Amino acid sequence: MRQPPGESDMAVSDALLPSFSTFASGPAGREKTLRQAGAPNNRWREELSHMKRLPPVLPGRPYDLAAATVATDLESGGAGAACGGSNLAPLPRRETEEFNDLLDLDFILSNSLTHPPESVAATVSSSASASSSSSPSSSGPASAPSTCSFTYPIRAGNDPGVAPGGTGGGLLYGRESAPPPTAPFNLADINDVSPSGGFVAELLRPELDPVYIPPQQPQPPGGGLMGKFVLKASLSAPGSEYGSPSVISVSKGSPDGSHPVVVAPYNGGPPRTCPKIKQEAVSSCTHLGAGPPLSNGHRPAAHDFPLGRQLPSRTTPTLGLEEVLSSRDCHPALPLPPGFHPHPGPNYPSFLPDQMQPQVPPLHYQGQSRGFVARAGEPCVCWPHFGTHGMMLTPPSSPLELMPPGSCMPEEPKPKRGRRSWPRKRTATHTCDYAGCGKTYTKSSHLKAHLRTHTGEKPYHCDWDGCGWKFARSDELTRHYRKHTGHRPFQCQKCDRAFSRSDHLALHMKRHF
């Protein structure tokens, strides 16, 4: 005997919830028989258990997708058999096709799995609690949630019911810790569908590029996990069912069977893209190709040239190879031999310091290349030239000299010529003939000034007003005149004092020492 519809049944009918008899693929009598037998006869439940897409709606049995999701939750909770309501009349076939064309199944599925409307959640929670208390279910009672939230029991394909205990043994996602499912479950299916976002979240899920995953290495039994880590972006709202647990699930293998797949839910807001950062080995870029880099301070010695001997060069000014190559007249350099190792030249003793060794870049050339040398005392770099006429390269801008075909031969150093290259001492030819003096001078003017000391002649007079001083030498008058003007040209470098005479400054500097 049917009872009159209650408030919960009216609310379900107002929300366009169909009868659960429409979910079966056969008539009502066959559906009742299959439900009593406990066989999984609902295709919608099977697709949810495998986390696959929803199949097309059966002809003649249209229903609302959101209502179907809520009804599946009620049946899994154990209240599906007792919940009654008004059945929706089937629509004609043409209207069914038009209705199915207007439905976006991917969008509805993703939104229904993420967060259902509060009104429908409250209605279904109240009806589920009332129905579960009135009539028992064939699969066993399940604890209804106290709050208006959903717990989606996603079970394996061959798990018809829930385990006794209230939370369900086959649950994959939930607030309470659930034991592993009884049936083997491959996470390759979850790799296609996000735990909480559906197919829409699949489009927003960032995956790591296989290029940036380290290569597979053989692992001992139980030695750890190496494989592909896929970061699942969880788009659930705060406080929802799938936003709280942070679980990393591991499958037995990837779709190709080479390595396991690890799925980690990400609850940190919108999905982020992983920056593709590739680390490469640091390579030294030199102008000489494969040879070692040359610095200004240390430079390898020269090897034997096939056309001549080594080239000596002085240490200063030390000019780097980069400066040589950056000059205007530089030639393209050739790569060094692969087996090159710098060592001091054989023609130089080992006791010389490194700075005294010849500073010529090591190069081996077989062929008819022209070698050229700079002037003695300047750094020389011999570079090959592929033309018929060679050119000498001396940094930065020394004159070029053409050499006959031959080898790089060092030139003999030539002595420099200058004004004071040889010592010249003037002889004192001017001697004072005054009795008892005997002084000699190199200049006649000095001797003439000296004779004034003997004769007492003072031809230099001070013309300052009121001053009648006379002097035998002009430099003495100049120093005297500074007393009237106050001019002190000799400044002390240690302090702020200045003097009018240089000898006075020399005496003053002895105090600082």
Swiss-Prot record:
Chain intervals for the UniProt region annotation (Interaction with target DNA): 473-504
Crosslink (Glycyl lysine isopeptide (Lys-Gly) (interchain with G-Cter in ubiquitin)) position: 32
Zinc finger (C2H2-type): 430-454, 460-484, 490-512
Subcellular location: Nucleus; Cytoplasm
Interaction with ZNF296: annotated segments: 416-513
GO biological process: canonical Wnt signaling pathway; cellular response to cycloheximide; cellular response to growth factor stimulus; cellular response to hydrogen peroxide; cellular response to laminar fluid shear stress; cellular response to leukemia inhibitory factor; cellular response to peptide; cellular response to retinoic acid
Post-translational modification remark: Ubiquitinated. 'Lys-48'-linked ubiquitinated and targeted for proteasomal degradation by the SCF(BTRC) E3 ubiquitin-protein ligase complex, thereby negatively regulating cell pluripotency maintenance and embryogenesis. Polyglutamylated by TTLL1 and TTLL4 at Glu-411, which inhibits KLF4 binding with E3 ligase component BTRC, thereby impeding ubiquitination. Deglutamylated by CCP1 and CCP6; deglutamylation promotes KLF4 ubiquitination. KLF4 glutamylation state plays a critical role in the regulation of its function in cell reprogramming, pluripotency maintenance and embryogenesis.
Residue numbers bearing the Phosphoserine modification: 254
Keyword Transcription appears in the UniProt entry: yes
Entry annotated with the keyword Phosphoprotein: yes
GO MF annotation: an example: promoter-specific chromatin binding
Domain of life: Eukaryota
Biotechnological relevance of this protein: POU5F1/OCT4, SOX2, MYC/c-Myc and KLF4 are the four Yamanaka factors. When combined, these factors are sufficient to reprogram differentiated cells to an embryonic-like state designated iPS (induced pluripotent stem) cells. iPS cells exhibit the morphology and growth properties of ES cells and express ES cell marker genes.
Quaternary assembly: Interacts with POU5F1/OCT4 and SOX2. Interacts with MUC1 (via the C-terminal domain). Interacts with MEIS2 isoform 4 and PBX1 isoform PBX1a. Interacts with ZNF296. Interacts with GLIS1. Interacts with BTRC; this interaction leads to KLF4 ubiquitination and subsequent degradation. Interacts with IPO7; the interaction facilitates nuclear translocation of KLF4 in dental papilla cells.
Family indicated by similarity: Belongs to the krueppel C2H2-type zinc-finger protein family.
Function: Transcription factor; can act both as activator and as repressor. Binds the 5'-CACCC-3' core sequence. Binds to the promoter region of its own gene and can activate its own transcription. Regulates the expression of key transcription factors during embryonic development. Plays an important role in maintaining embryonic stem cells, and in preventing their differentiation. Required for establishing the barrier function of the skin and for postnatal maturation and maintenance of the ocular surface.
Written domain comment of the UniProt record: The 9aaTAD motif is a transactivation domain present in a large number of yeast and animal transcription factors.
Protein name: Krueppel-like factor 4
Annotated organism of origin: Homo sapiens
